[in-house]
């Protein structure tokens, strides 16, 4: 089984957790990025740097991930494309994307995009701390177990 990572936006702590799970469960990890990254020095990890361009990494993930695999991403429209293809998607904060919550997640994302463009809200997400790492580890374990069972 493969775990794909949208590597440009994934926190290093989450990438490190994914590699630990991969070593323990004998999984392949594929990091896809639009910019060069530091690849963890383990044989189970591959780094693919796609040509720069709008959504190039997203397009690569959608084209190459298959049902039964997991993609780690924060990008809600990317997750929507993956879910429609039957690929599991999880954000680095431990929130799983699925058919039931995708409409709401897209609506919230679009609302905040509009508010940011109007200058009504600023900044991004809260810092990635221990609580987020634990939530991610728990969700990652749960989803990998489910996918392994088929």
From Swiss-Prot:
**CDD domains per record:** PIN_YqxD-like (cd18720)
Any Pfam family from its record, for instance, is DUF188
Q: Which NCBIfam families does this entry report, sorted A to Z?
A: PRK00124.1
| InterPro entries (UniProt xref) | UPF0178 (IPR003791)
Which sequence ranges form a coiled-coil region, renumbered to this chain? none
The lineage, from the top, is: Bacteria, Pseudomonadati, Pseudomonadota, Gammaproteobacteria, Pseudomonadales
Signal sequence residues: none
What is this protein's name? UPF0178 protein PSEEN5341
Species this protein is from: Pseudomonas entomophila (strain L48)
Family indicated by similarity: Belongs to the UPF0178 family.
């Amino acid at each position: 089984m493969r775990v794909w990572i949208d590597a440009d936006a994934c926190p290093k702590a989450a990438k490190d957790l994914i590699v630990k799970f991969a070593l323990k469960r004998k999984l392949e990890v594929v990091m896809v990025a639009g910019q060069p990254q530091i690849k963890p020095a383990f044989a189970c990890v591959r780094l693919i740097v796609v040509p720069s361009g709008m959504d190039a990494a997203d397009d690569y993930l959608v084209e190459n991930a298959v049902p039964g695999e997991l993609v780690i991403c924060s990008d809600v429209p990317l997750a929507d494309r993956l879910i429609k293809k039957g690929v599991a998607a999880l954000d680095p904060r431990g929130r799983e994307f699925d058919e039931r919550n995708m409409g709401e997640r897209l609506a919230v994302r679009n609302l905040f995009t509009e508010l940011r463009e109007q200058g009504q809200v600023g900044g991004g997400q809260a810092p990635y701390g221990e609580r987020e790492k634990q939530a991610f580890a728990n969700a990652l374990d749960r989803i990998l177990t489910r996918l392994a069972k088929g």
